[in-house]
């Protein structure tokens, strides 16, 4: 199980991303509209002003039950080994058993 501080850090990043989402999107639209290079550099500077953790690339999908950041299945929101355990225990309807 992931440490609680890491999970809280991830939640903080999600809140920051939601807060600065509109600013980033509007700045990117402005860059595509402007033709002069100097104006593009100014707008690019605005894009760099929000905090780093507000960038969507800094977010990780985490397992719903354990908080593990790797090997997650989007459809279930679970990591691979938890998914396998739950499928074998017949807790996920519609999933077929496999052994690997």
Swiss-Prot record:
Which coarse location class describes where this protein primarily resides? plastid
What is a single molecular function from GO for this protein?
Answer: structural constituent of ribosome
Identify one Gene Ontology CC term for this UniProt entry.
Answer: small ribosomal subunit
Ligase is among the record's keywords: no
Where is this protein localized, as stated in its record?
Plastid, Chloroplast
* GO annotation, biological process: translation
Ribosomal protein among keywords: yes
What keywords sit in the KW lines?
Chloroplast, Plastid, Ribonucleoprotein, Ribosomal protein, RNA-binding, rRNA-binding
Protein function: Binds 16S rRNA, required for the assembly of 30S particles.
This protein's assembly is summarised as: Part of the 30S ribosomal subunit.
The entry's family comment says:
Belongs to the universal ribosomal protein uS14 family.
- The name this protein carries in UniProt is Small ribosomal subunit protein uS14c
Q: What is the lineage of its organism?
A: Eukaryota, Viridiplantae, Streptophyta, Embryophyta, Tracheophyta
């Amino acid at each position: 199980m992931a440490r609680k501080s890491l999970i809280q850090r991830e939640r903080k990043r999600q809140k920051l991303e939601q807060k600065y989402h509109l600013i980033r999107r509007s700045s990117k639209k402005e860059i595509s509209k402007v033709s002069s290079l100097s104006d593009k550099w100014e707008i690019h500077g605005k894009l760099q002003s929000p905090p780093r953790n507000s960038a969507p690339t800094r977010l990780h999908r985490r397992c719903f039950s354990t908080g593990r950041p790797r090997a997650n299945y989007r459809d279930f929101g679970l990591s691979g080994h938890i998914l396998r355990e739950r499928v074998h225990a017949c807790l996920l309807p519609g999933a077929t058993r496999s052994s690997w």
